[in-house]
Amino acid sequence: MKSTFAPFARPLYVMSKPIGSACNLACDYCYYLEKSHLYKQNPKQVMTDELLEKFIQEYIESQTMPQVMFTWHGGETLMRPLSFYKRVVELQKRYARGRTIDNCIQTNGTLLTDEWCEFFRENNWLVGISIDGPQEFHDEYRRNRQGKPSFVKVMQGINLLKKHGVEWNGMAVVNDYNADYPLEFYRFFKEIGCHYIQFAPIVERIYKHADGRHLATPLQSGDKLAVFSVSPEQWGNFLCTLFDEWVRNDVGTYFIQLFDSTLANWVGEQPGVCSLAKTCGHAGVIEFNGDVYSCDHFVFPEFKLGNIYEKTLVEMMYSERQQTFGQEKQTKLPTQCQECEFLFACNGECPKNRFAVTADGEPGLNYLCKGYHQFFSHVAPYMDFMKRELLAERAPSNVMEAIREGKI
């Protein structure tokens, strides 16, 4: 029997791209810069005030919960003037109708000023900073269009955020270069006072498109792996080494998204990150012109759901097509994954990385599988302990004392 369609069983979430893919940096591994090729007919790729208002009103009215989260992403979001985001706040207040509105914005940090930071603090915006660890690691790939390094400017921006008391977190890309130095990486974030950290593995394949794009879509078999991609072995070693440092010293003080999500899956709760969830499809993207796509990592013509001027957000995000997109994260898992002891923790990770084949030659295996399996095997005793603590309504941070006492 076909399951009943319940469109409001989960919240609607759409990330906004007010500047499209435009950016003042040209990071070698960026998967979004080349999206400009999809909109060559739009010389000025910025969200208009008209579209902004339509999106904000419709997005708020589409929510079934009293809290509404807006996420502003790029490209480089601060290439839009401060007046644009002041307009955002005005419109949110106009259409809130009693709902609590929260905002988070992702930036490379190089354009931050006192004025920006005052705005973020006054309006309680959460700021995500893209920074790839210490200067040597960061500047390897994160440079501007003239090839000049960006680390110094990013740190100036972070210091401004701290000066003004702005809430912020770190997002670091783990690549072929920095993956070999997990402790230096992690300790750097502690030194700069970053307590919430997301480590994202970069995996891309090369595929020449007629329109100038050079990265493969999830449906294409890329000619070769991009040189900056982290290897499965590197990823596994990185996570295990990092975890050993964290679980002995920093549980409850420093929060690493992947570790928190893993523990959530261990106790049967929602992981809070789509890549480790059973299904996905609940986090869409709206481009500067109103085009809506299935996911930030699936901004390709094949995954365009429509345009906000032609369809509502509800129609697109709860469409059968998007439902299928999300369900296929689970239904298209190869047999090796379905029979894996850690399926509950991994759930196949992100579908965009499922271009490897299993030992039996079945397609659809995640490229990073070996690394994740190494990680889950390594952390299992500690996760089991923290799970017991949580179920007994005790602090997971008790794991640190248990390790010191030799109980684990």
Regions found by a protein language model. Give the residues of each.
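Radical SAM enzyme [4Fe-4S]-AdoMet core and its adjacent flexible, acidic
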Residues: N144-V152, N159, K163-S275, T279, ...
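Conserved alpha-helical substructure of the radical SAM core
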Residues: M1-E118, E122-N124
